[in-house]
Every structure is written in structure tokens, then in C-alpha cells.
Design a protein with these regions (language model features):
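Composition-driven recognition of glycine/serine/threonine/acidic- and proline-rich low-complexity segments
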Residues: 2-204
Length: 204
């Protein structure tokens, strides 16, 4: 099996294509939803061990927002879209037409709005991956959680069962007046991970 380091180093262009297409689609969708012009930075894309996700996104005790889904059809596993609280609050305030400095706890309507945005962004990346691999990837109904990063990162194993050792992580930054930081994380089962690499034309 090719190592993660080899995948990340030798096939950087293939991974970047997933990130660029997904982020481009996500930017357009979010801009339409918010009614704003949104700029996008170049996404950072890598495969990494599942146990390294926590340290890659920041402090484990930081409160973040996570939108989580299962995936099925040609591949099995789970996926998440994670945002820091400031980014999530900014998006919700825009959608609800509130002042930018509104900082109350999220109510059910707010969480529903966050979930919808997360679903759109995650779906954009899934579509990019599906288009480049030729695989059919079907997401389940999403759910949203607001908690410490360590707690949210433990949810996929509890909700969706076992998954493989490796994850695809895409860090994306959008900006209008405020920078919005987000992480798309796909955690395929081991057999599905191999299927993704093979479908991208990467040797196993």
C-alpha cells in the first residue's frame, strides 16, 4: 500500500484538483445563499491518519460547530464539515439578517441554518470527488453539533461505526468582510479508501 506521505507528495496536483473544484462550487453556493460576493483562498488538501485530525484543526478544548453525515453507495464511511464558532456565528447572522456583533447562543433555527450551509459545502466537495473518481457517493441526512473539538471528532465512530485509518482533509478559507475557516473531512472505510486511490489513478 502506498504511504500517505507518498500520496500527498507525488499526487499533490490530483488532490489539489479535488479541493479547487469543491471549494469553487462551495463558494458559489454559499455566496448565492448569503447574497454576497465571497472570495476563496487556495484550499489545503491532504490525506492524514485519523488520529492526527484533532491536532491539525486546533485545540481539542476549543468549541466548534460540526456538521456530520454518513456516506454510502460506491464508498462507505463518514464525513464532517467543521467551523470555528466565529465563522458559524458570522454565517448565521448573515442568513438571519442580524447585526454582525450579535453573539447569542444558537437556537434551533440557527442550528438548522448552520446545518444547511454545512451540507451545501460538504456536498460540493463530495461532488468534486465523485466527478474525479467516477464513483457514486451518497450522503445521509446531516446532523449538527456544537461542542469541544475533541467531543465532535469522537462522534463519527459512535454514530456511523468503524471507519478506516486514513482521512481526506481539505482546509478552506472563504472571506467577505470576515474570514470563514472550515475543514471538510472524509473518513472512508479501508476498502473505500483503496477504491478512492485506485479511481484517482493512484497506485496501491
Amino acid at each position: 500500500m502506498i504511504s500517505l506521505q507518498e500520496v500527498n507528495e507525488k499526487y499533490r496536483d490530483v488532490l489539489a484538483e479535488i479541493g479547487n473544484i469543491g471549494a469553487g462550487n462551495a463558494t458559489t453556493a454559499v455566496a448565492d445563499m448569503l447574497g454576497l460576493r465571497i472570495d476563496m483562498s487556495v484550499p489545503q488538501v491532504q490525506f492524514l491518519p485519523v488520529e492526527e485530525i484533532g491536532t491539525s484543526i486546533g485545540a481539542e478544548d476549543e468549541v466548534i460547530v460540526g456538521i456530520m453525515l454518513g456516506v454510502g453507495s460506491d464508498i462507505d464511511g463518514s464525513m464532517m464539515f467543521l467551523m470555528d464558532m466565529e465563522s458559524a456565528q458570522h454565517i448565521v447572522n448573515r442568513l438571519m439578517m442580524r447585526p454582525d456583533d450579535y453573539m447569542e447562543d444558537f437556537d434551533e433555527m440557527d442550528l438548522s441554518a448552520v446545518k444547511e450551509v454545512g451540507k451545501i459545502i460538504a456536498g460540493s466537495y463530495l461532488s468534486a470527488l465523485s466527478g474525479l473518481t467516477g464513483l457514486t457517493i451518497t450522503p445521509t441526512v446531516p446532523f449538527v453539533a456544537v461542542d469541544m473539538a475533541a467531543a465532535i471528532l469522537s462522534v463519527p465512530a459512535i454514530q456511523f461505526g468503524m471507519f478506516g485509518d486514513n482521512a481526506l482533509m481539505i482546509k478552506t478559507e472563504f472571506s467577505d468582510e470576515l474570514q470563514i475557516n472550515g475543514y471538510f473531512i472524509l473518513m472512508p472505510e479501508e476498502e473505500s479508501y483503496e477504491k478512492i486511490l485506485s479511481s484517482l489513478g493512484l497506485p496501491l
